[in-house]
Every structure is written in C-alpha cells, then in structure tokens.
Amino acid sequence: MGKSVVVLGAQWGDEGKGKIVDLLTDRVKYVVRYQGGHNAGHTLIINGEKTVLRLIPSGILRENVTCLIGNGVVLSPTALMQEMGELESRGINVRERLLISEACPLILPYHVAMDKARESALGNKAIGTTGRGIGPAYEDKVARRGLRVGDLFDKQSFAEKLKNILDYYNFQLVNYYKVEAVDYQKTLDEVLAVADIITAMVADVTTILDVARKNGDNILFEGAQGTMLDIDQGTYPYVTSSNTTAGGVSTGAGFGPRHIDYVLGIIKAYCTRVGGGPFTTELFDEVGAEIARKGNEFGAVTGRPRRCGWFDAVAIKRAIQTNSISGFCMTKLDVLDGFREVKICVGYKMPNGEIAEYAPLAAKDWEGVEPIYETLPGWQENTFGITDVNQLPENTRNYIKRIEEVTGVPIAILSTGPDRVETMILNDPFAV
C-alpha cells in the first residue's frame, strides 16, 4: 500500500520544507502543492548547487516524480513562465512533468498593484506581505469574480472578463489609493502570450490523486508558509491568505482527509518570523543577532531579514492541534552550536497572570504575553553535517529529547545542514 504524507511548516514558515520535500521525493510518484503561490521560497541545495522554487513543487528536481499544482494554489502566469524557464535552461523537463488544476485562481498585474498599494497605505501597520498579489487573488476567488486557469481556454471570453474586473480594480487604485491604473491591453497580451503553454498542462488533479491512491502510489503534499500564518488558525491579521494547515490538502487538492496517512511538521531548532505580527520568544540582543547570522536568516523570495527567537513549544502545541502532526523534522540544529545555554518556551504568562499552554489565535490576545523558559545547557561541539544521531553531543540529544517531551510528538528527521545528505531519518514517514 502506498502512503500519503503531508509536509508542512509548524511555525511561521521558512522552516526548511523544500530540502525535506526534496529528500523524501525519492520515495514518491507525485508531489503536490495545495495552497499559497509564488510567495513561497523553497530553497534546495543539491551537490552544492542552489535552487529556489517558488511555485513549482520541489519534486521537479527528481526525474521520476510528477508534480501537481492543486486548485488551492494562486497561480501567476508570469512567475510560472520565469520559473519554468530557469529550470528548463538547466535541462530539467518541466512541461511533461507538471500538471495544473484548471480551478487555480490567476494572479494578474492588478493583484500585485493592489497588494503594494494597500501595504503602502498601511505604513507602519502593514501586514508585511511579499507584495506579489497573493491576498487580492484569494479575495477574488472568495468573491467569485476571479479569473482562473480554466478561463484561458476561451480567449475571447477571458478578454471580456478581464476588462470588467480591471475596471473594478483601476477605479480603486486611481481614486482611493491615488496610484497609476493597470493597462488592460498590456495585461491581456502578456497573459494570452503564454495561455497555450499553461492550458497544455491542465489536468484533473483530484482524479489523478484518487487513482494514484488506489494504485498504491506514494504521494507527498508540499505545504507553503507555516501553520502560524494560516488565514484561520494563525496570528490574524498577521497571516497569509490561504490555509497552510493540513486541512488545506483536502480543500486545495481535492484529496479526502481520511486518506492522509502521516503529517510531518517541519520545525527549526529555534524560531523565526518575517514581517509584522506577534512573536513571543523574539530576541533583540546579541544572541538573536548571532542566530540570524549563523542561520543566514533572510527570506528566500524577498531577501528580508527574519526575526529570530528561542524555540516556542506553546506555539508548536497549537500547530500540533490544528494539523494532527504525526512527527517532526527539526532543521538547522547546527545553528545552535556554540551557545552556552539554549532555551525552550514552555508556557505563556498572560497579562491577567494566568499561564497558557497553547498559543492564542488573534494577534491582539498576544499583547503583553511573557514567555516562560526552561534553560538547558548548550553545546560547544560542531554538529554540522552529522548523519548519525549517536554522534551528536549529549546536550544536543537532551535538547531534542526535551522538545519531544514538552510537545508530546517524536522527532522523525533531523537536519544538520542545507544539503539533502546532511540529514538523519530516524523514522521514515513513508515506512510507518
């Protein structure tokens, strides 16, 4: 029997999902993106060569894997063509191995213009979006006015729909945000120039997955961003516009929840966050700066510096609840090498004096929250590239064990470097 495994971020994104997906794809026939868009930067380093994938599933680097983009993904034609071009220039066959749901909402230039205009208007209260039009595209989907991949099959109808929706957007952009209108003809020409390439890859993703499951094929679902950025379960309003949790697999790929066998939550050995929003364990001292330096904590897509802090088990417990996490993959363990002590946040002291074991939902409920830490001895030894858990320093193993105890979830995979070989698989999700 085949296995269906979900790989998702259990923190605020940037946990190292791309590497782990790539690592596990030698076991699978299909890799599926089910939410988000080209705001997700998945960095892979294979034999020293760096690849950043934003929209195309990370399985594209394995010749035996078919990659699927489900209906929950918002798709930018421009970003897709650029990414395909980069991969094809390296001899990677994309067009015969990438299939796209016709129900994917399209991200078009007016979405990007609106995203940037809104963030600019918010000033220091900005959400911290990537400015790539993700939110406005999801808005159009929910409002039932958005254009989808399937609309590209009828170019005349597409042109008419585009005219109507662009009038709607330009009225807001010009009259409310006082910015330049988006040109209709330029937008239309750009999309129609690549329409045939995109429609040639359209397929019934739900049926493909159902047949694969019945045939006993292994399937991997690749999440983007992280649990605490989920539109419903995250630190609202400082969230993304999609369901980043495991439930997004069903709504974003048409795969029934009963058929999910394992949920692998990716966690860093510490915590990071990009953009605004609450972050209880954030460090503003030299320790935080050192973690950022050693971890090279800059966004793969935006290049923005990430905020850094100690491991937050309280936030992780919320992620465990919302995802039914089966096991963790801990990444960037080596970044904590050399610290005299390491800390784990095991509780939140709320403004009313109560102790919370689970993170609040709304951002406003995080105000005035203080972290309650357990302090453990650090380790001076170098763990970079270690591939045998028994070779890890005793204090490193104690740190890992304590996180397992506090969260109640076992660590199935350990990563000690960016390359796929710098990994320890303690419990293979596809062998469970």
From Swiss-Prot:
SUPFAM superfamilies: P-loop containing nucleoside triphosphate hydrolases (SSF52540)
Entries under Gene3D superfamilies matching the protein: Adenylosuccinate Synthetase, subunit A, domain 1, Adenylosuccinate Synthetase, subunit A, domain 2, Adenylosuccinate Synthetase, subunit A, domain 3
Matching Pfam families: Adenylsucc_synt
Xref: InterPro entries: Adenylosuccin_syn_GTP-bd (IPR018220), Adenylosuccin_syn_Lys_AS (IPR033128), Adenylosuccinate_synth_dom1 (IPR042109), Adenylosuccinate_synth_dom2 (IPR042110), Adenylosuccinate_synth_dom3 (IPR042111), Adenylosuccinate_synthetase (IPR001114), P-loop_NTPase (IPR027417)
GO-annotated cellular components: cytoplasm
Gene Ontology molecular function: adenylosuccinate synthase activity; GTP binding; magnesium ion binding
CDD domains named among the record's database cross-references: AdSS (cd03108)
Binding-site list for IMP: D14, E15, G16, K17, N39, A40, G41, H42, T130, R144, Q225, T240, R304
Pathway: Purine metabolism; AMP biosynthesis via de novo pathway; AMP from IMP: step 1/2
UniProt catalytic activity: IMP + L-aspartate + GTP = N(6)-(1,2-dicarboxyethyl)-AMP + GDP + phosphate + 2 H(+)
EC number per UniProt: 6.3.4.4
GO biological process per UniProt: 'de novo' AMP biosynthetic process; IMP metabolic process
Record-listed GTP binding positions: 13-19, 41-43, 306, 332-334, 415-417
List of catalytic residues: D14 (proton acceptor), H42 (proton donor)
Similarity section: Belongs to the adenylosuccinate synthetase family.
Alphabetized PANTHER family for the sequence: ADENYLOSUCCINATE SYNTHETASE
Entry-linked HAMAP family: Adenylosucc_synth (MF_00011)
UniProt function note: Plays an important role in the de novo pathway of purine nucleotide biosynthesis. Catalyzes the first committed step in the biosynthesis of AMP from IMP.
Protein name, entry field: Adenylosuccinate synthetase
